[in-house]
């Protein structure tokens, strides 16, 4: 049987290019079975990265059989209830076994994640009641269910994600956050890595010239650093323009993307993915801002100056 520590150390986190520092931090936390919240803007691969973490873990013994450890996802939402996480009484089983019998209990997602990973996406949308529900489980790796006198095992690693730009339904309490390590994830480190991410999508409807693609990515990265914006475009925006520019060229019966095809995609792809600062949004619209930035800044220098995240 492969030891837990050896498995985590020797296996690679796949599916996300770059982010070497974040990957090492995640491995370090998982090695000690610590709970983690991965913090970063949308569209940078947080979910993909978390999904790949279960591959670090060795097989686990379930009823005498060696199987892959479970990976259970919970989507943060104001509608999420304690019963979704912990479980509830099944009426039909309660009739058969009695309402106080553990056999009448249908386990929730935290028990399904036992010996594996519980992925809590958008954990900053977790209500105070749910935070309190999780406190015992995170600390003791067990949960006491209602009036039952039995503690149920819930030995999982919780990996949460959150977007710092979005408000939570209720602030995460200091007591709750004290159960986690925080790891901060940023957009791709360089233009070259971002280009590699884009090309890995294998979308080749028409030819996208390499220099034009570099300039397109450089333009997005320039917006990502803009002091005029309080919400910046993610890698999803880059992928969107890459795809839509090809579509525009194809609809024009062209075999090669040109600048006009990129320009025609800018407003549709970017206008809702950025937000102007209050000092600017009363002076110009988002559409006007994007057109000005494109006309003034889309040039050959972008490919050389796009290495800041």
Say what each PLM segment does.
Residues 4-44:
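Pre-Walker A (pre-P-loop) alpha-helix and adjacent loop at the N terminus of AAA/AAA+ ATPase modules
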Residues 16-18, 37-42, 61-66, 97-110, ...:
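Conserved Walker
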Residues 27-77:
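Walker A/P-loop
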Residues 32, 221-229, 239-257, 268-276:
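AAA+ ATPase "lid" subdomain C-terminal helix
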Residues 42-43, 48-51, 251-309:
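C-terminal engagement/docking regions of AAA+ P-loop ATPases
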Residues 79-113:
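Short glycine-rich substrate-engagement loop in P-loop NTPases that contacts/grips substrate
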Residues 119-120, 156-163, 245:
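Structural recognition of the conserved hydrophobic beta-strand(s) that form the central parallel beta-sheet
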Residues 171-187:
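A short helix-turn-beta junction within AAA+ P-loop NTPase domains corresponding to the substrate/partner-engaging
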């Amino acid at each position: 049987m492969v030891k837990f520590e050896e498995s985590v150390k020797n296996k690679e986190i796949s599916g996300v290019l770059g982010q070497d520092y974040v990957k090492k931090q995640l491995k370090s936390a998982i090695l000690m079975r610590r709970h983690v919240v991965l913090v970063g803007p949308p569209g940078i691969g947080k979910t993909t990265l978390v999904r790949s973490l279960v591959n670090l873990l060795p097989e686990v013994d379930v009823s005498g059989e060696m199987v892959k450890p479970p990976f259970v996802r919970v989507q943060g939402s104001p509608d999420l209830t304690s019963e979704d996480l912990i479980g509830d009484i099944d009426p039909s089983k309660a009739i058969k076994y009695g309402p106080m019998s553990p056999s009448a209990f249908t386990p929730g997602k935290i028990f399904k994640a036992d010996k594996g990973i519980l992925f809590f996406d958008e954990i900053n949308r977790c209500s105070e009641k749910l935070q309190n529900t999780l406190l015992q489980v995170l600390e003791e790796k067990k949960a006491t269910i209602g009036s039952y006198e039995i503690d149920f095992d819930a030995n999982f690693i919780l990996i949460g994600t959150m977007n710092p730009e979005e408000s939570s339904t209720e602030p995460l309490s200091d007591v709750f956050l004290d159960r986690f390590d925080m790891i901060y994830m940023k957009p791709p480190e360089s233009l070259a890595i971002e280009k590699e991410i884009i090309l890995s999508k294998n979308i080749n409807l028409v030819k996208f010239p390499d220099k034009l693609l570099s300039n397109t990515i450089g333009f997005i990265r320039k917006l990502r650093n803009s002091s005029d914006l309080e919400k910046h475009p993610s890698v999803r925006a880059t992928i969107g323009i890459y795809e839509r520019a090809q579509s525009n060229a194809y609809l024009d019966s062209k075999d090669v993307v040109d600048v006009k095809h990129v320009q025609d995609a800018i407003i549709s792809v970017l206008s809702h993915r950025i937000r102007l600062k209050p000092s600017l949004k009363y002076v110009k619209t988002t559409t006007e801002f994007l057109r000005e930035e494109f006309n003034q800044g889309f040039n050959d220098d972008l490919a050389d100056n796009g290495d800041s995240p």
